[in-house]
């Protein structure tokens, strides 16, 4: 094995020990063309690929070293050109691919060799040509200048400079031709288009030029640029003075041209390192004269990351693989390069995972299902097709042939995408373990048998592979050390393993294990076969202790430590014997299989959990959970995630065990190690073996329990992720709001909010948004809609707004229930004033979901869009936009805003990774269902936000796509231009083309002869265009000869036009027998296209028909929750809530909750009726009382409540979980309840009568309760409480920092009685007259001094250990400087540490500083300020040093 392979193995080993290793894929791996099977470059081995990916130059010094210098230079030149050619070829279509694309698009591609090259020109109308001539000349100049703009870093030109240079030459010629031949431009456009398409694959006109010629060409090009830069700048409408002033402020846009010029030259000639190589004749080596300049040399790396412009980002942009796949596979090596056997294993492995949730019957034949899964895997891994494409255009390959059979859903496909990554990790680890085993040069029957079984059976799991690896490390530590020793001799580094087991194995004590009578391997065989193949043999004469004594006596010199402690020797032998058993893979495999099959989960409460988990707690439903099975967690995955969360908070521990676990262990012992003899000798040896075996099994149980917890957590995260994803999809899956479904035009919208609802003092804000979603204007309605003195004024203003803007829909929402009052008023005005649309229908008014508007009104995006508008105007704009498109509104939220959405109650249990997955996959599915209009996205950043979710795209590719479109400087006319203009490459085009559409109606008005423009506005994929034309021809019932003629002439698209114009097209299309047509097509071509045919028929009837659900109108319960913030968990019938008395109405009482829900207390629901007194004599205004909810009126946002004592005491708390004794520990619950009652009674007995002090800061707390109360408060907050020292003491508890509180004692003197407040209060020897004086003169001074110190630059936050480490590190970096910092003393609240070092060599000193109400006390002196404290410290230090020096003299 080579040194390089050994080094690689060592690196992989370090990664594998802690899980699957990760490594960045090379450029060739990431950028390999999946359609190109060419392997011309056989000399480029893996080492070269890796070096290239790392940015190094491959020096082929080992090839042809005997050739002369000239041959070496020629070879390098040829190799550079060959690499450039190959890089261009990888991203371009082959001739066959282009022919196929043109054929599917209905364009017949000529084969003549003299066709002109260049990009597809914009088609012009005849009337526009003369006007465009001058514009073209100006455009040429502006485009050349544009090349130096910073945003062109995203340009595709970086990778295709030779191609662009050639295009510039051709473009210049084309423009000159256009100016000179304008009279001939009305000729056959179709022919011209075909000529240009024919030259899509460029020929490298510089392929044969030598280095000197190339340098000359670059020099000429540079001179041309300099001439252009020297030319005077003309800007229409600006004088030269204004232009100069503008340049002074903004620059001329060429500040970074030096870097771009170098980069352009690099791209022109390939790798800049290669370009700058010089051949040294003396050494025979190449030397580099320049350093490659990248974007990181110009911009800050953080800015590049923020704008997705790092080298990794640019690589993802250019690699012709879907961006989401690249991100998922970034940690894998050689993804997709599986053997045929591994591919079959992957299909079976993933099929088993997916089938779990399909509920197939036990006798269901999975053959067809596995075939469908295999097809999906092939599409994902081999063809790099994303889920939306597979589901839309390959559905017949992932479903049953039976009509009511299975179908792999989008959920299944996304799961397969991630399972493929997991499987690749398993295979990588398996291959590593195989190489590791092979390098050891040993043969272990157990390992050999394991890999033999894995090659013929199902794939190994990571856990079993880890077992093999751990087994090898444990058993063959010496061989590993020998191998490492050989490598260290070569590299000079030593990383040898220190194995205690090897030391024990070489000692005399190991003889006792050999005498046990059955080895670990034999135990593994017995357990694996469930039969005692190897029968244990007891020692002939000696018991275990006797044998140990004998061994110790015979080896007293080596084992002296055990002579006086034979028990230690016994324990040591049993420990290592148990290790041998626990590392045996057969034992672990059997125990793991049984444990996974029969395990149960119990909750074991901690003391903290018993105390804190009470009724109403989040963890109430799992407090006494027992015997929970895997099936329970699959049905309710959130339960296990909740358990893990509670465990992390130290509220409980999870105990995983097998049912009848003790009996199981006894059974294994009987078949593996127990002898049937009944003699005392046999009993002793059986006891010895069982003790060791029990230790081994317990160790295995613990390991497997942790494995199960990890696996179960991942499984439950996936299941909850699916639930959250579906819930979020319901939010996205809404069509725009349309008042009249028969006339589906977007409405002109007026949205309103009344803010806090203070009518008459606060204005009502409204915003008008037109049909295009553009904000037009806002309105501020100051008139009070409920003004009784002038009720018509508001109505007139509102009517005028509606009539002026011609509003067709009204939306409303707000932050409180006052909005409902306005809503009812607006309905009244609409009917009273008869405000109707053009069809005479009353203008609808609806509540609009405002979760996005709430986030938008104060967002950075809103500030950029509408910097001068108040928040409520922005709120209304967002409401209107939501009515136009909920999808667009959600898509424009930032990642942080998306995560803050309340999607589902269980989303808090998801890790950020799974939450992001749920959100992104939901976006991808819905966006591709809707489609994206390409030209609209080009100049509308709001609309373009959905591009990143198009199949094959991502954030980076969406940016690249938009910049490529913008460089065209003209609308895209056909999908085929995405290929012919080099905007997309093969794989991304295949993924995205069907979801990117071009509006045909607009295009037809300007461009009449472009082929297949009508199909470009449908969901029909370009690969099916030819099939669509045949469907149209069959529907029109043309004879085969006519169809064949048009097919031969390339005019099949005419059938589409004929069909569109046919008034009976629906009946003709629906009469087609698509099933038989699909069968015939599959028989002839092998393609399964039934679903595609159905799509073609639907799209020919109505291209990109709206497939989303109707806009969701908020129901009364949702409106109630939106305006009040209450949910069915916080406000429900039977619950008890606090209400504030607002007014009295006859014998009723009107109250209000904290959420402003109006509550009515009827006369029979309060004490007034019982004592026959009016309620205002019993209840006080503005006072809060507990009330029980009797009824909730959701439409009117009111409730009926009761203030009666017996109602309040009988609160209804519904039990939402099962207390079935089979899964709930009733016995433990009862015991804990009794214990809690005892503790409560003991505490109540110990408590004295609570003192009541008439002061706003006095609370009936003890010390712990005071700390808990202040924990969420700010620094400096405090409470006054009763002291534990007796009735003549009080205490102040105040907060110094997070989880840091000081308790200050107050002694009371001159008390009138034990419960009265003393007339004199003493704090730290200082006398005060009342509590307020203590607060002002003592406590507030301490708070001020605390804030002064903590805000000083010499204060360091953190623990003592952290501050000490910081000072030590600082001192090492600055060895000659002294350093000191203050930090909080968490062990003694009210004290600070003063930590300092004089220099790097001195010891670390820690002094204590006390915080007083007059300053800081340090070394017998009080310093009033922090500055004086620092100066005093320095003075003390200086005097201390002086004394030390004088003492040495």
From Swiss-Prot:
| Cellular compartments annotated | Nucleus; Chromosome
Q: Does the keyword Transcription apply?
A: yes
Q: Where is the composition biased (Acidic residues)?
A: 26-47, 59-71, 88-100, 154-164, 195-212
The record's GO CC annotations read: euchromatin; transcription elongation factor complex
A single MF term (Gene Ontology): DNA binding
Where is the SH2 domain positioned along the sequence?
1256-1353
**Which residue intervals are annotated with compositional bias (Basic and acidic residues) in the record?**
134-149, 165-193
Which keywords label this protein?
Chromosome, Nucleus, SH2 domain, Transcription
Single GO biological process annotation from the record: nucleosome assembly
Biased region (Basic residues) positions are 75-84
Identify one Pfam family in the record: Tex_central_region
Alphabetical list of SMART domains matching this protein = SH2 (SM00252), YqgFc (SM00732)
- Stretches the record annotates as Disordered: 1-214
Q: Which InterPro entries match?
A: RNaseH-like_sf, RuvA_2-like, SH2, SH2_dom_sf, Spt6-like_S1, Spt6_acidic_N_dom, Spt6_death-like, Spt6_HHH
Q: Which family does it belong to?
A: Belongs to the SPT6 family.
What role does it play?
Answer: Histone H3-H4 chaperone that plays a role in maintenance of chromatin structure during RNA polymerase II transcription elongation thereby repressing transcription initiation from cryptic promoters. Mediates the reassembly of nucleosomes onto the promoters of at least a selected set of genes during repression; the nucleosome reassembly is essential for transcriptional repression. Essential for viability.
Q: What is this protein called?
A: Transcription elongation factor SPT6
**Organism, per UniProt?**
Candida glabrata (strain ATCC 2001 / BCRC 20586 / JCM 3761 / NBRC 0622 / NRRL Y-65 / CBS 138)
Q: What is the lineage of its organism?
A: Eukaryota, Fungi, Dikarya, Ascomycota, Saccharomycotina
Supply the gene name.
SPT6
């Amino acid at each position: 094995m080579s040194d390089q392979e050994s080094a690689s193995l060592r690196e992989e080993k370090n990664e594998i020990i802690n899980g699957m290793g990760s490594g960045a894929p090379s450029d060739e791996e990431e950028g390999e063309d999946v359609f190109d099977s060419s392997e011309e470059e056989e000399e480029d081995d893996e080492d070269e690929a890796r070096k290239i990916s790392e940015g190094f130059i491959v020096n082929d010094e080992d090839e042809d070293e005997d050739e002369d210098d000239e041959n070496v230079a020629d070879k390098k030149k040829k190799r550079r050109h060959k690499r450039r050619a190959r890089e261009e070829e990888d991203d371009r279509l082959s001739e066959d691919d282009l022919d196929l694309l043109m054929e599917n698009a209905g364009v017949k591609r000529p084969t003549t060799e003299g066709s002109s090259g260049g990009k597809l020109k914009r088609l012009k109308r005849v009337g526009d040509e003369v006007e465009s001539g001058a514009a073209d000349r100006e455009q040429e100049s502006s485009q050349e200048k544009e090349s130096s703009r910073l945003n062109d870093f995203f340009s595709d030109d970086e990778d295709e400079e030779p191609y662009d240079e050639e295009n510039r030459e051709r473009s210049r010629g084309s423009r000159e031709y256009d100016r000179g031949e304008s009279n001939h431009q009305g000729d056959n456009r179709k022919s011209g288009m075909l000529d240009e398409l024919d030259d899509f694959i460029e020929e490298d006109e510089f392929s044969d030029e030598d280095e000197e010629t190339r340098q000359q060409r670059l020099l000429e090009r540079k001179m041309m640029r300099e001439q252009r830069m020297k030319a005077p700048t003309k800007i229409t409408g600006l004088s030269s003075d204004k232009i100069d002033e503008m340049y002074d402020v903004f620059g001329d846009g060429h500040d970074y041209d030096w870097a771009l010029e170098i980069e352009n030259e690099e791209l022109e000639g390939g790798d800049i390192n290669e370009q700058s190589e010089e051949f040294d004749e003396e050494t025979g080596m190449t030397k580099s004269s320049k350093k490659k300049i990248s974007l990181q040399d110009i911009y800050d790396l953080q800015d590049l990351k923020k704008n997705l412009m790092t080298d990794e980002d640019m690589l993802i942009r250019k690699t012709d693989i879907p961006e989401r796949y690249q991100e998922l596979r970034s940690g894998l090596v050689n993804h997709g390069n599986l053997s045929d056997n591994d591919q079959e294993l992957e299909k079976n492995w993933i099929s088993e995972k997916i089938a779990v949730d399909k509920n197939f019957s036990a006798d269901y034949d999975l053959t067809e299902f596995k075939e469908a899964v295999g097809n999906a895997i092939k599409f994902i891994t081999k063809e790099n097709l994303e889920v939306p494409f597979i589901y839309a255009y390959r559905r017949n390959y992932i479903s049953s042939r039976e009509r009511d059979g299975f179908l792999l859903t989008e959920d299944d496909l996304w799961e397969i995408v991630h399972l493929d990554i997991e499987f690749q990790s398993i295979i990588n680890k398996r291959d590593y373990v195989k190489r590791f085993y092979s390098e050891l040069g040993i043969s272990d029957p157990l390992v050999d048998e394991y890999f033999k079984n894995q090659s013929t059976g199902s794939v190994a799991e990571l856990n079993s592979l880890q077992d093999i690896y751990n087994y090898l490390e444990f058993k063959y530590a010496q061989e590993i050390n020998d191998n490492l020793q050989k490598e260290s001799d070569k590299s000079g580094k030593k990383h040898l393993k220190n194995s205690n087991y090897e030391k024990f194995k070489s000692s005399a004590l190991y003889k006792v294990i050999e005498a046990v009578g059955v080895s670990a391997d034999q135990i593994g065989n017995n357990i694996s076969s469930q039969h005692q193949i190897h029968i244990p043999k007891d020692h002939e004469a000696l018991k275990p202790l006797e044998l140990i004594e004998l061994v110790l006596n015979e080896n007293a010199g080596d084992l002296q430590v055990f002579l006086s402690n034979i028990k230690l020797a016994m324990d040591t032998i049993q420990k290592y014997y148990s290790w041998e058993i626990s590392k045996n893979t057969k034992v672990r495999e059997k125990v793991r299989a049984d444990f996974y099959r029969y395990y149960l989960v119990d909750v074991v409460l901690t003391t903290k959990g018993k105390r804190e988990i009470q009724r109403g707690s989040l963890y109430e439903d799992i407090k006494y959970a027992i015997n929970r099975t895997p099936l329970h967690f699959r049905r309710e995955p959130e339960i296990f995630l909740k358990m893990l969360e509670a465990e992390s908070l130290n509220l409980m521990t999870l105990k995983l065990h097998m049912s009848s676990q003790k009996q199981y262990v006894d059974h294994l012992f009987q078949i593996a190690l127990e002898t049937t003899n009944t003699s005392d000798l046999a009993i002793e040896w059986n006891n010895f073996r069982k003790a060791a075996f029990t230790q081994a099994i317990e160790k295995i149980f613990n390991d497997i329990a942790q494995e199960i917890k990890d696996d179960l957590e991942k499984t439950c995260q996936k299941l909850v992720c699916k639930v959250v994803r579906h819930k979020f999809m319901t939010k996205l899956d809404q069509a725009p709001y349309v008042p009249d479904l028969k006339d589906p035009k977007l409405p002109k919208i007026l949205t309103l909010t009344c803010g806090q609802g203070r009518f008459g003092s606060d204005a009502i804000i409204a915003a008008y948004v037109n049909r295009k979603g553009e904000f037009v204007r806002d309105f501020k309605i100051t008139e009070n809609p409920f003004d009784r003195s002038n009720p018509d004024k508001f109505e007139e203003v509102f009517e005028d707004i509606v009539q002026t803007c011609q509003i067709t829909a009204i939306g409303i929402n707000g932050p409180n229930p006052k909005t409902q009052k306005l809503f009812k008023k607006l309905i009244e005005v609409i009917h009273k004033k008869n405000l109707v649309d053009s069809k005479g229908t009353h203008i609808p008014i609806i509540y609009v979901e405002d979760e996005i508007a709430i986030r938008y009104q104060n967002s950075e995006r809103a500030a950029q869009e509408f910097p001068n508008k108040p928040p409520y105007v922005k709120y209304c704009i967002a409401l209107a936009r939501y009515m136009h498109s909920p999808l667009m509104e959600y898509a424009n939220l930032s990642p942080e805003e998306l995560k803050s959405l309340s999607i589902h109650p269980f989303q808090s249990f998801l890790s950020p990774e799974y939450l992001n997955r749920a959100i992104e996959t939901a976006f991808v599915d819905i966006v591709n269902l809707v489609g994206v209009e390409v030209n609209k996205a080009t100049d509308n950043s709001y609309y373009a936000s959905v591009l990143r979710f198009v199949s094959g795209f991502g954030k980076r590719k969406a940016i690249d796509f938009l910049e490529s479109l913008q460089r065209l400087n003209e609308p895209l006319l056909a999908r085929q231009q995405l290929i012919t203009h080099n905007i997309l490459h093969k794989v991304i085009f295949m993924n995205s083309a069907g979801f990117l559409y071009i509006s045909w109606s607009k295009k037809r008005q300007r461009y009449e002869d472009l082929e297949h423009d009508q199909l470009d506005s449908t969901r029909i994929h370009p690969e099916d265009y030819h099939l669509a034309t045949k469907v149209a021809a069959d529907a029109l019932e043309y004879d085969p000869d006519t169809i064949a003629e048009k097919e031969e002439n390339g005019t099949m698209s005419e059938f589409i036009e004929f069909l569109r114009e046919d008034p009976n097209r629906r009946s003709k299309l629906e009469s087609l027998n698509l099933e038989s047509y699909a069968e015939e097509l599959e028989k002839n071509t092998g393609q399964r296209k039934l679903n595609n045919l159905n799509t073609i028929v639907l799209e020919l009837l109505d291209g990109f028909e709206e497939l989303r659900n109707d806009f969701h109108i908020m129901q009364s319960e949702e409106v109630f929750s939106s305006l009040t913030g209450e949910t069915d968990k916080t406000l429900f019938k039977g619950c008890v809530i606090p209400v504030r008395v607002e007014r009295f109405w006859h014998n009723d009482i009107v109250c209000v909750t904290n959420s402003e829900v109006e509550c009515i207390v009827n006369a029979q629901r309060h004490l007034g009726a019982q004592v026959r007194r009016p309620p205002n004599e019993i209840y006080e205004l503005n006072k809060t009382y507990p009330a029980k909810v009797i009824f909730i009126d959701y439409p009117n946002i009111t409730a009926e409540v009761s203030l009666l004592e017996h109602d309040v005491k009988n609160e209804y708390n519904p039990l939402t979980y099962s207390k079935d004794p089979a899964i709930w520990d009733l016995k433990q619950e009862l015991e804990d309840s009794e214990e809690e009652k005892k503790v409560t009674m003991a505490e109540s007995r110990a408590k004295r009568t609570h003192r009541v002090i008439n002061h706003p800061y006095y609370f009936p707390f003890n010390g712990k309760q005071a700390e808990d109360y202040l924990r969420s408060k700010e620094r400096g907050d405090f409470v006054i409480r009763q002291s534990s020292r007796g009735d003549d003491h009080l205490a102040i508890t105040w907060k110094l920092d997070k989880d840091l509180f000081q308790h200050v004692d107050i002694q009371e003197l001159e008390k009138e009685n034990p419960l009265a407040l003393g007339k004199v209060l003493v704090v730290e020897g200082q006398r005060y007259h009342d509590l307020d004086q203590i607060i002002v003169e003592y406590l507030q001074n301490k708070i001020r001094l605390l804030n002064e110190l903590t805000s000083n630059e010499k204060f360091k936050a953190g623990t003592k250990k952290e501050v000490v480490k910081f000072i030590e590190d600082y001192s090492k970096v600055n060895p000659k400087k002294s350093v000191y910092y203050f930090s909080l003393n968490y062990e003694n609240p009210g004290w600070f540490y003063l930590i300092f070092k004089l220099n790097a060599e001195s010891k670390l000193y820690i002094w204590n500083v006390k915080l007083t109400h007059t300053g800081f006390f340090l070394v017998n002196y009080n310093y009033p300020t922090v500055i004086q404290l620092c100066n005093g410290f320095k003075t003390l230090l200086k005097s201390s040093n002086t004394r030390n020096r004088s003492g040495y003299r």
